[in-house]
């Protein structure tokens, strides 16, 4: 059996993408057709080209549809007489029965730290549930196969018959705030579900940070950074942090960051002038165009050749393009100024307005550093709640709150020693604008609603030659740290916990795709958590804008982007264009398996370079199944079978056969998964 691949942070293929390549196809308005060919590839194309000899033989010329199992459906039906899933939307069955079924197989090696209570009652419940399931099988509702054929037309079945097509439900995630204010308030959309009854239910599954009661309701209790738990006024530089690195802030660095000011334009005031110089690649504004007396543009001065908006839901539209132009100029001036230690001139000036607030006034003082890498340093700031009717425009409150204090994460970004100023400017602008737009924007760019599973990007500031991004703060760290702590016990996460996180992950990714952006670097390090288990996607520096507001069709890209264990196989094929949405789907599957198993599926999806991935391809082409997926267990056999089918359809090395994110969310596995975040369906 191949050796397991241990978790590691050192596996990056590419960490950033230039703005112009992220927006490849911007203002190329050809007639709809096949994806445009790109002469210019990403920086990682050189690396993938070097791997060309290994990537060409990726599939070995052998393809075969993946089946769930070689065993017959009759055999499966005979043994699959379990109680209704505890995560079913149709009705909550007894978790005691499901728990007895799952843990009654013997001492499962992957769950040594699970405690069960109420053994005698569980046994009686299991007997009753078994009898009920037998009665249902004799004349009850349709089987799981019928449900699968009705709702998952894209899934690949072992039978020759094709699944019937069905329309997809149109759904969208709602806006929600992630606060932990005291007092009994109604749960807003996107927040943790409130219990319908205050009656205490018996806990039947209890882990360090995850519990499930007898009604099937679960609760996450993730650890909070000790830096936040203790008094921010007296923190000590010796405790746990996200990346296992903690340092107390230095006085000099603290003073430098505290003097930073926002470089975002103030849309609430009348502007004396606007930036009219666009990006060199995009000539869109007329030089004669000037703002009218109300700060807008007159009909005579509207931008020339402005393309028509055909996709109003896209994250990148007219307002974002203006912001890109503004920030590019501001950053460029700040980096090229004669005196880098003086405040650079601002492209926007306002009439009779207050001076811009510095970081210390707006977001509080730095209380500690929680991460450091080649691309920047992450700090935590703390301030008291706004007073005197101060508004969110000046004091954003959509962040973590504890004991009357707001906490923010700030990322200090400097250009690398060998990085040209122009490249640094486009990298920083791309990362900020994409994240800022997806998190709802602000002021004049507030077009989209925020999503509970997208980390909010609040501000971009400058202190001399240093630039600072401001985010909402997630005090429970990232998924990588959670998995690292869990793997020390010899197991991954509980299946119900992993399912909840998977559903949140897929909803966040679908929101990005619905707005024309693919993440392209999904991995545990880019998944953050709040203490109540709300998942947040972050780090949009490698994201690809595959469709803007002016484009009717999706464009593809080439070159490997991301971290090797999570990169889809088609990315390693030189000069091959691929759909970034399907790449994200592959990465989500890898992340889920990593959560359940506690280790990577493989190190890299290249047959000639990775023995485990090669064995996966051989097993799938010869037997139609993979032993890792076959050996996975769940609390319910039907859910386990649905999950297994989904995994086989996620890990289709031919992207044309791979399931999409919306269809994956519409499978019985995900629809029957209880998620601790409320999503409102849009009809």
UniProtKB/Swiss-Prot annotation:
Biased composition (Polar residues): 69-85
InterPro entries: Kinase-like_dom_sf, Prot_kinase_dom, Ser/Thr_kinase_AS
Residues where ATP binds: 370-378, 411
Residue ranges, annotated region (Disordered): 1-90, 157-200
Biased segments, Low complexity type: 36-48
Biological process annotations from GO: intracellular monoatomic cation homeostasis
Coiled coil feature spans: none
Catalytic-site annotation from UniProt: 521
Residue stretches of biased makeup (Gly residues): 50-60
Domain of life: Eukaryota
Gene Ontology MF: a single term: protein serine kinase activity
Catalytic activity: L-seryl-[protein] + ATP = O-phospho-L-seryl-[protein] + ADP + H(+); L-threonyl-[protein] + ATP = O-phospho-L-threonyl-[protein] + ADP + H(+)
EC number: 2.7.11.1
Domain Protein kinase: start-end pairs: 364-670
Keywords tagged on the record: ATP-binding, Kinase, Nucleotide-binding, Serine/threonine-protein kinase, Transferase
Xref: Pfam families: Pkinase
Alphabetical list of PANTHER family matching this protein: SERINE/THREONINE KINASE, SERINE_THREONINE-PROTEIN KINASE HAL5-RELATED
Similarity-based family: Belongs to the protein kinase superfamily. CAMK Ser/Thr protein kinase family. NPR/HAL subfamily. HAL5 sub-subfamily.
Name under which the protein is recorded: Probable serine/threonine-protein kinase HAL5-like
Organism annotation: Eremothecium gossypii (strain ATCC 10895 / CBS 109.51 / FGSC 9923 / NRRL Y-1056)
Lineage: Eukaryota, Fungi, Dikarya, Ascomycota, Saccharomycotina
């Amino acid at each position: 059996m191949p050796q397991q691949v241990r978790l590691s942070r050192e596996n990056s293929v590419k960490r950033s993408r230039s703005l112009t390549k992220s927006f490849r196809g911007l203002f190329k308005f050809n007639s709809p057709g096949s994806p445009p060919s790109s002469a210019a590839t990403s920086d990682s194309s050189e690396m993938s080209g070097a791997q060309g000899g290994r990537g060409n033989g990726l599939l070995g010329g052998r393809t075969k549809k993946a089946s769930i199992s070689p065993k017959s459906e009759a055999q499966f039906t005979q043994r699959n007489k379990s109680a209704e899933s505890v995560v079913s939307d149709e009705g909550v069955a007894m978790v005691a029965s499901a728990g007895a079924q799952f843990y009654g197989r013997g001492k499962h090696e992957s769950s040594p730290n699970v405690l069960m209570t109420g053994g005698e009652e569980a046994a009686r419940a299991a007997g009753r549930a078994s009898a009920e399931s037998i009665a249902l099988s004799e004349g009850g509702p349709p089987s799981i196969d019928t449900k699968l054929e009705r709702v998952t037309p894209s899934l690949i079945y072992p039978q020759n018959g094709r699944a019937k097509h069905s329309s997809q439900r149109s759904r969208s995630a709602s806006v929600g705030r992630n606060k932990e204010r005291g007092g009994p308030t109604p749960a807003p959309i996107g927040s943790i579900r409130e219990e319908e009854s205050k009656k205490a239910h018996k806990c039947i599954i209890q882990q360090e940070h995850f519990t499930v009661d007898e009604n099937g309701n679960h609760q996450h209790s993730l650890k909070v950074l000790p830096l936040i738990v203790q008094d921010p006024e007296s923190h000590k530089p010796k405790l746990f942090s996200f990346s296992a690195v903690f340092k107390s802030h230095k006085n000099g660095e603290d003073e430098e960051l505290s003097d930073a000011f926002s470089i975002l334009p103030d849309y609430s005031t009348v502007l004396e002038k606007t930036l009219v110089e666009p990006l060199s690649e995009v000539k869109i504004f007329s030089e004669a165009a000037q703002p009218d007396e109300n700060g807008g543009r007159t009909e005579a001065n509207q931008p020339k050749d402005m393309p028509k908006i055909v996709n109003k839901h896209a994250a990148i539209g007219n307002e974002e393009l203006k912001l890109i132009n503004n920030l590019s100029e501001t950053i460029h001036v700040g980096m090229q100024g004669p005196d880098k230690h003086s405040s650079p001139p601002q492209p926007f000036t306002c009439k009779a307005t207050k001076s811009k607030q510095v970081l210390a006034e707006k977001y509080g003082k730095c209380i500690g550093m929680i991460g450091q890498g080649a691309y920047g340093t992450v700090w935590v700031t703390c301030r008291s709640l706004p007073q005197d009717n101060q508004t969110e425009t000046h004091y954003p409150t959509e962040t973590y709150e504890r004991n009357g204090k707001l906490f923010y994460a700030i990322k200090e970004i400097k250009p690398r020693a060998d990085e040209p100023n122009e490249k640094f400017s486009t990298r920083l602008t791309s990362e900020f604008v994409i994240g800022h737009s997806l998190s709802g924007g602000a002021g004049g760019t507030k077009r989209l609603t925020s999503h509970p599973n997208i980390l909010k990007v609040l501000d971009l500031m400058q202190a001399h030659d240093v630039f600072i991004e401001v985010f909402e703060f997630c005090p429970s760290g990232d998924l990588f740290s959670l998995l690292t702590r869990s793997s020390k016990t010899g197991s991954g996460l509980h299946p119900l916990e992993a399912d909840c996180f998977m559903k949140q992950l897929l909803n966040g990714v679908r929101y990005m795709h619905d707005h024309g952006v693919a993440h392209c670097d999904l991995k545990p390090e880019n998944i953050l958590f709040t203490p109540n288990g709300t998942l947040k996607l972050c780090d949009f520096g490698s994201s690809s804008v595959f469709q803007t507001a002016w484009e009717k069709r999706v464009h593809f890209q080439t070159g490997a982007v991301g971290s090797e264990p999570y990169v889809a196989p088609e990315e390693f094929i030189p000069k091959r264009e691929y759909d970034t949405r399907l790449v994200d789907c592959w990465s989500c599957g890898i992340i889920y398996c990593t959560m359940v198993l506690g280790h990577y599926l493989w190190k890299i999806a290249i047959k000639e370079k990775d023995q485990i991935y090669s064995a996966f391809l051989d097993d799938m082409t010869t037997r139609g199944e993979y032993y890792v997926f076959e050996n996975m267990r769940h609390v319910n056999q039907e859910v386990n079978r649905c999950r297994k089918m989904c995994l086989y359809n996620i890990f289709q090395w031919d992207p044309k056969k791979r399931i999409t994110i919306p269809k994956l969310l519409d499978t019985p596995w995900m629809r029957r998964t209880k998620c601790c975040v409320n999503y409102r369906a849009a009809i």
